Curated annotation (Swiss-Prot):
Residues 237-367 form the DOD-type homing endonuclease domain. Gene3D superfamilies: Hedgehog/Intein (Hint) domain (2.170.16.10), Homing endonucleases (3.10.28.10), P-loop containing nucleotide triphosphate hydrolases (3.40.50.300), Translation factors (2.40.30.10), Translation initiation factor IF- 2, domain 3 (3.40.50.10050). It comes from Methanocaldococcus jannaschii (strain ATCC 43067 / DSM 2661 / JAL-1 / JCM 10045 / NBRC 100440) (Methanococcus jannaschii). One of its GO terms (cellular component) is cytoplasm. One of its GO terms (biological process) is translational initiation. The keyword Protein biosynthesis applies. Residues 561-781 form the tr-type G domain. GTP binds at D634, T635, P636, G637, H638, N688, K689, I690, D691. This is Probable translation initiation factor IF-2. The keyword Nucleotide-binding applies. Function in general translation initiation by promoting the binding of the formylmethionine-tRNA to ribosomes. Seems to function along with eIF-2.
């Protein structure tokens, strides 16, 4: 009996993985030189110029500055596709040290910090580890604008220059109203750019003339193109000008070019071809001036030294592809050459910038190219030129979509396409082997001639070979192969093949063999694996590294934040990473038993991996870890932490607070500590970037084994201690926490442990994993006990649309077991959703087969703690942060009650009046509300979701009763388009950010300014006190109006002020004040001015020279001034107020008058 109880106790003592969240400073510090060009949706822009575009500062100190950007850039997504996504932030950081310049064989190069990773055929590799001969990824395609209306908007914004003259549509003239001085414009139908803007006129024809000429002067006008076809003529002309053009003419012998240019006649331009001895010139008559000016304005065509100064203009990214194709066709018609011997298209230019830009522009047509520097003789000297080559069957076929207008060039293009057999090479030999084994195929079963030479690396496969290989992947005789591999059946050929592939060694299954067997049995392969690789070869190419150069640099470097952690700069895919990547990383490239397992929204680090990484430390500290591992939430920062809530506080069991040891605490660090304190979540501090401490010798492995005088210079140790105390321990002390280096901590329940780490070198990562695992096991054991028989409890991390699945949720299960077919119960803000679980999905393992990262496999059940994707009907209204239960039918009511209680507890108390707040999740809404309440802000309504039209109209009603409530504070959400119009209509202030402390700071600052403005407005409306005396010999008119000279004894006399005598008799109102003959609105103490008084006063009868007059301030105004605005009054104004109050108290016989 006792034995049975023991077994049951052990079952109940099972521990789940602690859930770990990372907060604080998790930036990467991997940056580019200022001049490197980022590929945006509107062309290439230097990264330092992108920084200048970002005006709103998110964070700034002496070492770095982060700005909001919100510009769309090209990136490589997780599906292997080049896409355009938003880059919300741009970074500028101080850097002193080495930079690495990587030059590729296609000519493109880029200079980055040593730790900046490049995508290679062997995964992401840091710049400092890139070697000559490696292959780096470049995009095969890019995108530009295809919206014709947006293109026309760009044209209109560009041509409205100071010198533009236009003729408008005759119908529009009827509605144009001009002053008589400008009526000639209407009569002659000639207008300047400002007239177009002011009267919103439709441009019919254009010309250009300096302002010194009246716009009525006769001009040769050309029609402004309206349609796509009309614009094609302009773009083709521009391309030819970039090739064979000079200032205003074209030197070209090809009749086809002339015939194509004649389409400019439709725009009012006369085109002629003239023979000059042995060559021809094409000249333009009538509209030449307008045409050339248009070329300069729209295409940045240089006025001099054309061949050296041309560059790819922005219009070629904003124009639809059909127009860009005409430009390229014109340029290649003029300067392009089809090399029949080398099977390639060539073009040469003296402008390096143009050729580099052209190679990027060609990617809009999925054409990759190579650039070479060549020397050509010119007037007995050798000059530098740049040659761009287009080679390879795929590129040549894609160029044919652009084509030539010149017959012999088009014929030669067809010839070299026919002769070309191969396209770009893809050095993915290892991946081909992995995929083949994944699909259970032997080498002989792959339908590719001489396949072995590609897999063995003797020859790099071309695009065509890879495509053929992917199309041939299909499992064959898998059941038999499984039996042979298990030893249940014998087949000599298969055994030889398995031995050759490394699945069997000395008659035994290898690790790879066991892995393959497991994959084949579970059918962990599918079409998505092939689709991913197909997508990759359509979207990127690999180019060999020609040279790597190390440069010393002292200055600023720049980087972008993107969701995919990569972007394209100088035509190369570059990457950024965070401390999370280092925490998740294993030190082996292939998957091993017990390797990191990808969950949805999280990464599980098994205890075997932790023990392997922390081996020496565990022995030294005699630690025995019993937890199954750590579940690290993939999304860093407050957003993830606040979104992951459960009843009783945060879902995370323990947190890692990342702080830069060199920079110390930032406002967001303090915010993170406050959130952790509020949620009562234990945390450790990762003191990051110890590798940047002067003199520190940082290396991969445990920090504690590197922290000694043997490995570190005494000065470096001293500097470490100073930074540790000043930047981390002291700020934590000020926030009410004892803290110290983890190896010195005696009682971890009372002192925060600080673990020094480097995300760059990996130093301290074992210490960090060991401390997090050890603390979780020691102090959170009861919390980690797993209810293996109970139903699943969890929280929604994210709601996503998935192709083929519809709306799905990514959830973290923190207790119990989730089973497919059970019922999903979701607690919504105002309701409970009950729906059937259609599928539980987990990502396929990151194994030897290098499966795509975001491909899922269905599972029947999931045990806590785990991240899982749930597919179910009716998930449209579900939001992140909602509590969930997955239960059998008989437990639905109980689960509904639980989630309702949890949602009710999370509801935010609202006030009778206040502002409206919005957030992306329930948890972040709660965190935002708490921070606002600390700042004394009243909240009338708090909701999850984007800012809607209804929200704005509701806030407009709040504003009517109190202007300070006419605001919306929104965290990590969007403003919907229809809401934006209402915001402008009602003048509602919206505060939008994804950093809570910044939102609160901005809002409270606005409140202060608004209160001051309102107070100032109210104060200005009050009648101010003043005492004046009529000067001797200064009565100039006795009445209607009475005019006299006065001295302001104290206070401020203003126009409109009511005046009274010392006995209280009302005299009238100040109509006018003059100071030395000039009208003024007020006169302050000490001033002598003349005043005109409207009213019944008669000077010398009612008041005379030397008499005093008082401004008759109403009692209500006196009370306001005395109680609310005394601090705003000058001393003489206070004197005037107090003397006036004293007088009125006597006159009314009321000592409380005005008080």
């Amino acid at each position: 009996m006792a034995k049975k109880n023991t077994k049951k106790d052990n079952k109940n003592q099972n521990l789940r993985c602690p859930i770990v969240c990372v907060l604080g400073h998790v930036d990467h510090g991997k940056c580019l030189m200022p001049h490197e060009k980022v590929l945006t949706e509107y062309g290439e822009i230097k990264i330092e110029d992108l920084f200048k575009i970002g005006k709103e500062i998110v964070e700034k100190d002496e070492l770095k500055e982060i700005r909001k950007l919100n510009i769309k850039v090209h990136t490589l997504n997780e599906n292997g596709e080049i896409k355009i996504i938003n880059a919300p932030y741009v970074w500028k950081l101080k850097h002193k040290g080495k930079m690495i310049k990587v030059k590729l064989k296609n000519w493109h190069s880029i200079t980055t910090t040593p730790e900046h990773p490049f995508l290679t055929n062997n995964g992401w590799i840091k710049a400092e580890n890139i070697k000559k001969g490696m292959y780096v990824a470049i995009p095969r395609k890019i995108y530009g604008n295809e919206d014709f209306e947006k293109f026309i908007e760009f044209i209109n914004s560009k041509i409205l220059t100071n010198e533009l003259i236009v003729k408008v549509n005759e119908k529009d003239l009827k509605n144009v109203e001009l002053p008589s001085t400008k009526i000639y414009k209407k009569q002659k139908n000639v207008f300047r750019s400002e007239d177009i803007i002011e009267h919103n006129l439709n441009i019919e024809k254009i010309s250009f003339s300096p302002r010194i000429h009246r716009c009525g002067k006769p001009q040769h006008y050309i029609k402004l193109p309206k349609s796509l076809n009309e614009w094609k003529a302009i773009f083709y002309f521009a391309g030819v000008m970039f090739g064979d053009g000079c200032v205003d003419r074209i030197a070209n012998n090809d009749e086809e070019v002339f015939n194509k240019l004649k389409s400019l006649n439709n725009l009012g331009i006369e085109v002629e071809r003239i023979k000059r001895k042995s060559s021809y010139e094409i000249i333009f008559k009538n509209g030449k001036n307008a045409l050339i000016n248009l070329l300069k304005i729209l295409f940045d065509y240089p006025s001099e030294k054309k061949s050296h100064n041309i560059k790819i203009p922005q219009i070629l990214y904003i124009a639809p592809k059909e127009l860009v194709a005409e430009f390229i066709k014109g340029y290649f018609d003029a300067d392009g050459y089809v090399n029949l011997r080398q099977n390639r298209i060539e073009v040469i230019s003296a402008s390096k910038e143009f050729i580099e830009g052209l190679s990027i522009l060609l990617l809009r047509f999925e054409i990759t190219s190579k650039i070479y520097e060549i020397k050509k003789s010119y007037k007995e000297t050798k000059k530098k030129y740049y040659q761009l080559n287009i080679v390879g069957k795929r590129n040549l076929k894609n160029f044919k979509n652009i084509g030539f207008s010149i017959k012999y060039k088009e014929e030669n293009l067809n010839k070299i396409i026919e002769k070309s057999r191969k396209s770009e090479k893809y050095p993915i030999n290892k991946d081909m082997k992995r995929l083949r084994i994944l699909f259970g195929m032997t080498r002989n079963e792959v339908n590719v001639s001489y396949y072995a030479k590609y897999e063995n690396g003797k020859e790099i496969p071309s695009y065509e070979i890879v495509k053929k290989f992917l199309n041939s992947l299909k499992p064959k005789n898998l059941d038999k192969k499984i039996k042979v591999l298990e030893g249940k059946e014998r087949d000599v050929n298969y055994l030889k093949a398995f031995e050759s592939d490394g699945l069997i060694e000395n008659g035994r299954l290898t690790k790879l063999g066991r892995e393959a067997l497991n994959i084949w049995k579970n059918h962990e392969f599918g079409k998505e694996n092939i689709d991913y690789m197909k997508s990759l070869i359509e979207n990127i190419a690999f180019v060999e590294v020609e040279d790597v150069e190390i440069i010393d640099y002292d200055g600023y470097v720049y980087d972008l934040t993107t969701e995919t952690h990569n972007f394209i700069a100088n035509g190369i895919v570059v990457h950024n990473t965070t401390l999370l990547d280092k925490i998740r990383k294993t030190r082996v490239a292939k998957r091993e038993a017990g390797g990191i397992t990808q969950h949805i929204g999280a990464s599980e680090i098994p205890i075997d991996v932790i023990k392997r990484l922390c081996g020496d430390l565990l022995k030294m500290l005699k630690a025995d870890l019993k937890i199954p591992g750590l579940l690290v939430i993939d999304t860093p920062g407050h957003e993830a932490f606040t979104s992951l809530r459960k009843r009783g506080g945060a879902l995370a069991d323990i947190a890692i607070l990342v702080v830069d040891i060199n920079e110390g605490f930032k406002p967001q660090t303090v915010e993170a500590v406050n959130i952790l304190r509020q949620c009562k979540t234990p945390f450790v501090v990762a003191a990051n970037k110890i590798d940047l401490i002067p003199g520190w010798n940082s290396k991969e492995g445990p920090f504690i084994l590197n922290f000694n005088e043997k490995n570190q210079h005494p000065n470096a140790l001293t500097e470490f201690e100073i930074r540790l105390y000043e930047n981390i321990i002291k700020p934590l002390n000020e926030l009410g926490f004892d803290a110290d280096l983890y190896s010195r901590v005696q009682d971890v329940t009372k002192t925060v442990c600080i673990i020094p780490v480097s995300a760059v070198t990996g130093e301290g990562i074992p210490d960090l994993l060991m401390m997090v695992a050890g603390l979780a096991q020691k102090f959170l054991e009861d919390r980690l006990k797993l209810n293996v028989e109970g139903y699943a409890k969890g929280t929604i991390l994210e709601v996503k649309e998935e192709k083929g699945l519809g709306t799905t949720i990514d959830a973290i299960i923190y207790d119990g077991i989730a089973k497919r077919g059970d019922y999903l119960v979701v607690g919504l803000p105002d309701d409970v959703l009950v729906t059937r679980v259609k599928a539980l999905l987990k990502p396929k393992p990151l194994d030897e087969m290098r499966d795509p990262r975001d491909k899922f496999k269905p599972v029947n059940e999931v045990t806590a703690a785990a991240g899982v994707k749930i597919a179910a009907p009716e998930l449209d209204k579900v939001i992140a942060g909602c509590p969930i239960r997955i239960v059998p039918k008989d437990k639905i009511e109980e689960a509904k009650e639980e989630v309702m209680k949890e949602v009710e507890e999370a509801k935010i108390e609202v006030d009778d009046e206040g502002i409206l707040i919005k957030a992306d999740t329930l948890g972040s809404l709660e965190a935002l509300a708490n921070e606002l309440r600390k700042a004394g802000v009243k909240i009338k309504k708090a909701e999850v979701g984007d800012v809607t039209k209804k929200d704005v109209i509701e806030v407009a009603s709040y504003k009517q009763s109190n202007p300070l409530h006419g605001a919306i504070v929104a965290f990590n959400v969007k403003i919907l388009p229809e809401a934006q119009k209402e915001i402008e209509k009602y003048d509602i202030k919206v505060f939008l950010d994804n950093i809570i402390y910044k939102l609160v700071e901005d809002f409270t600052e606005w409140i202060k300014k608004e209160e001051e403005r309102i107070k100032y407005g109210e104060f200005e409306k009050l009648i101010k006190p003043a005492i004046i005396r009529i000067l001797p010999d200064c009565i100039f008119r006795q009445k209607d109006p009475a005019i006299c000279g006065v001295e302001v004894l104290c206070g401020t006399l203003r126009v409109g002020a009511p005046l009274m005598r010392e006995d209280g008799m009302q005299l009238g109102y100040v109509r006018e004040i003059k100071d030395r003959g000039e009208n003024v609105k007020e006169a302050k103490a000490g001033k002598a001015v003349s005043i005109a008084i409207d009213g019944r006063v008669v000077l010398k009868r009612h008041v005379d020279e030397g008499d005093y007059m008082y401004v008759a301030v109403p009692e209500s105004h006196v009370r306001e001034l005395y109680h609310k605005y005394m601090d705003r009054l000058r001393n003489d104004e206070k004197e005037a107020l107090l003397r006036y109050m004293e007088l009125m108290q006597k006159l009314t016989n009321n000592i409380f008058w005005g008080r």
